[in-house]
Amino acid sequence: MRIGVLALQGAFIEHIRMLERLGVETFEIRNLSDLKEIPDGLILPGGESTVMSKLLQDLGLFEKLRSLIMTGTPVMGTCAGLILLAKYIEGGSPSLGTMDITAVRNAYGRQLGSFQATAPFAGAGNIQMTFIRAPMITHVGKNVKVLAEVDGVVVAAREDNQLVLSFHPELGEDTFVHQYFLEMIAGTN
């Protein structure tokens, strides 16, 4: 299994390290030539979603990534990655717009508004969640499954091959979310 991690900004190295701990081969996606071979899965990490969207266009990655996702390549978007995948952005324009959710950028405030929470994920036990200038999911489409909520707010969801998280699972020690994604790729959950 090979997972491509968008490596333009954000905590992409932490995602790579987490996957390597799980014995998964990874590669960095920095330009179109990095996608000559179709990956088994994609990770769109955190960062600044407006800048990332512009870089995707400038580097010629936008259409290729969108096409891979729309044709079924599993993708996990964390924080800014969630914003890139959201079909609707309150007060803004969507980017890739492949997942039937509505999101609000930086819903939890500035960097000082960062926090940690513990909540059940995907029907499993509690996991630690790190929120850094996190987006909020305010609406999910009829085919979207809510996987986690904190204080009644959706912070993780899945629609078919797309998994989005408001938080940063790569910044903790728990591998559960990445394992969930790998099982999603393997078709076992």
Curated annotation (Swiss-Prot):
Listed PROSITE patterns = PDXT_SNO_1, PDXT_SNO_2
Q: Which GO terms describe its cellular component?
A: cytosol; glutaminase complex
**What GO terms describe the biological role, i.e. biological process, of this protein?**
glutamine catabolic process; pyridoxal phosphate biosynthetic process; pyridoxine metabolic process
Statement: the UniProt record of this protein carries the keyword Kinase: no
Q: Give the quaternary structure.
A: In the presence of PdxS, forms a dodecamer of heterodimers. Only shows activity in the heterodimer.
General function of this protein: Catalyzes the hydrolysis of glutamine to glutamate and ammonia as part of the biosynthesis of pyridoxal 5'-phosphate. The resulting ammonia molecule is channeled to the active site of PdxS.
What protein am I looking at?
Answer: Pyridoxal 5'-phosphate synthase subunit PdxT
Which organism is this entry from?
A: Methanocorpusculum labreanum (strain ATCC 43576 / DSM 4855 / Z)
